[in-house]
Each structure stands twice: as structure tokens, then as C-alpha cells.
Regions:
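Acidic-basic catalytic patches of nuclease active cores, encompassing PD-(D/E)XK
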Residues: 1, 13, 97
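Beta-rich catalytic cores
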Residues: 4
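Conserved catalytic cores of phosphodiester-cleaving nucleases, focusing on short active-site segments
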Residues: 8-10, 15-26
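Mg2+/Mn2+-dependent nuclease catalytic core
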Residues: 25-43
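Helix N-cap / beta->alpha transition motif
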Residues: 33, 61-65, 84
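Nucleic-acid nuclease catalytic cores
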Residues: 43-68
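Short, intrinsically disordered terminal segments enriched in charged and Pro/Gly residues
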Residues: 68-75
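Charged phosphate-binding loop/patch that engages nucleotide di/tri-phosphates or the phosphate backbone
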Residues: 75-97
């Protein structure tokens, strides 16, 4: 196994692969390891995502933003921010369609 590979690998109905790193935070800090940042940055041209569950909201970032997300945390503007109850269909339409 290679260090830094995201938690989820999804294959859509068209055969395209999507990688999603899952994180949980109670503050503004998003803990990404150096290996995770390197992998997400290296493959940022593809469908790579970082999904962060905060206290109340769900934040979605593109993998190519991993370096900035690690340094700025949730202060970095997300690609998508969802309020509870989460609109999972909207999230899936953006990430795997």
C-alpha cells in the first residue's frame, strides 16, 4: 500500500475513478499528513477531493488545494459547503458525475 492514498476510491457508471480523503475536525484545523498532501497534489489534475466534516457543516475541497487547506484549515474557501441535513445528491453530482 502506498502512503497518502485517499480513504475512498469510487468508480462511477462511466468507469471513471474518483478519490476522496475523509476528515473530521472540531475546530478550523484540517489534519493532513505530508504523504496525503503529496499524493493529493501529485494527482490534483484528476478527480481528487477532500471531504471535511465540521461541527455542523460538511466542506468539500479539491485535492489540488491540499497544501493550502493544511495551512489555512477551514478558513480556506471550500469548493462546496453543505449545511445539515446534507444534500448528498448535490455532493455526489459534483464529485462523481
Amino acid at each position: 500500500m502506498t502512503l497518502g492514498i485517499p480513504d475512498l476510491l469510487v468508480c462511477d457508471t462511466k468507469g471513471k475513478f474518483h478519490f476522496i480523503e475523509l476528515k473530521v475536525t472540531v475546530g478550523n484545523v484540517v489534519k493532513l499528513s505530508p504523504n496525503q498532501v503529496a499524493w493529493l497534489t501529485r494527482h490534483g489534475h484528476g478527480s481528487t477531493w477532500i471531504m471535511v466534516r465540521g461541527r455542523e457543516d460538511l466542506y468539500l475541497y479539491q485535492g489540488k488545494d491540499a497544501v493550502e487547506l493544511r495551512s489555512k484549515g477551514l478558513q480556506l474557501k471550500p469548493y462546496l459547503q453543505l449545511k445539515y441535513p446534507f444534500d448528498w445528491e448535490k455532493l455526489f453530482d459534483l464529485t462523481i458525475n
